Structure formats: C-alpha cells, structure tokens
Amino acid sequence: MEPFVSRIYFGDLLAGTDEAGRGPLAGEVVAAAVILDPAQPITGLADSKKLSEKKREALFVEIQEKALAYGIARATIEEIDELNILHASMLAMSRAVALLSIEPEYVLVDGNRIPPNLPCSAEAVVKGDARHAAISAASILAKVTRDRDIVQVAQIYPEYGFEKHKGYPTALHLEAIRLHGITPIHRRSFGPVKKILEG
C-alpha cells in the first residue's frame, strides 16, 4: 500500500491517532495518539490487526519508550450507547490527543473523519494504520490496551469467553449471551444485544 505523506504539514510535531474496538458487542472503545521521535525510528510498525499478539506487545513497550509523547483514552459503554459508536470513537480520539504531553502541530487521523475539538489542524487518512508510522503506532497502543482491558473483564465474567473473542460477535459469544444474558459491559445499542433485550 502507498505510504501516506502529508502535502500540508512537513514538520516533526505530527501526531497519529486511531481507535480499537468499534466492532465488539462489549467493552469500551479505546483510542491512542502518538508523536513519534524522528531520531528514534521504530521498525516493524504496521496496522495492529496484521501483527501477531507477541509482536504487538513488544512494539507496545518500544513505542512508549521511544515516542516523544503518547496518550491513551477511552469512551465508556454508556457513551457508546448514548452517542453511537462512531461519535464515541471520535470522542476517544479527541481525548487521546488531549492527553499528549506535547501539543501536536498537526494530527493524522485513521479513517475518513476528523474528531471535533482537536488542538490543531488535522487530516483524515483512509487505511492510515497501514500507511503512516504514527497512526500505526497509535493503532498498536489502542489495540493492546483494549485487549488487556477485555482480558481483565474475562476474569469477572468467565462464562463468556471474552479472552478468546475480545467481545466480537462470534458464535461462541452469541451463544454465551443466549445462555447467560447481558452483562453490564455489553453495548445495549448494538443489534444482537438489543435484539436479546427486546426479547
């Protein structure tokens, strides 16, 4: 895939932001923002979904060690149900950018929409997690954090198998919902959950 190069911003204080967890039926949506250090390049950055769990975990540590700044934020299950998943994802990305210890001069956002309330100009990059290192780094921080969150939840609700499906609507997960009902971490606005609630 063609690497992305902004034709608007050419400086170094560029943040990438991405989210993880738009598709699952359960759990919060997690976003991250990263400003990479050009003096400390990180090899192996790619779309987090294309990397093995082991590789993601290693890069998760390296990104935090080498980045000039990073922020990780969430939108709650209540916010997802109230706003919808798209707006909740935008909110989480805005929060992640706001948590950066260095204010960016420009933000690259994975996808085709720009979150509101960013502190600077921004550009949306379709498939950005595979095309720009800063967005790739953000996608890795977001995915590893969300996966860790959901594995912790699995200890509270062991009968749902969250550690296996991470909250996605797999046959295993849907069967667990059918057998055991809805938990407080399920997104009530999502089709399969809504259907069960409506009986």
Swiss-Prot record:
Manganese or magnesium. Binds 1 divalent metal ion per monomer in the absence of substrate. May bind a second metal ion after substrate binding. Keywords: Cytoplasm, Endonuclease, Hydrolase, Manganese, Metal-binding, Nuclease. It catalyses: Endonucleolytic cleavage to 5'-phosphomonoester. The keyword Transmembrane does not apply. It comes from the Bacteria. This is Ribonuclease HII. Endonuclease that specifically degrades the RNA of RNA-DNA hybrids. GO terms for molecular function: manganese ion binding; RNA binding; RNA-DNA hybrid ribonuclease activity. Residues 12-199 form the RNase H type-2 domain. PROSITE patterns: RNASE_H_2. Its cofactor is Mn(2+); Mg(2+). GO terms for biological process: DNA replication, removal of RNA primer; mismatch repair. A divalent metal cation binds at D18, E19, D110. It is an enzyme of class 3 (hydrolase).
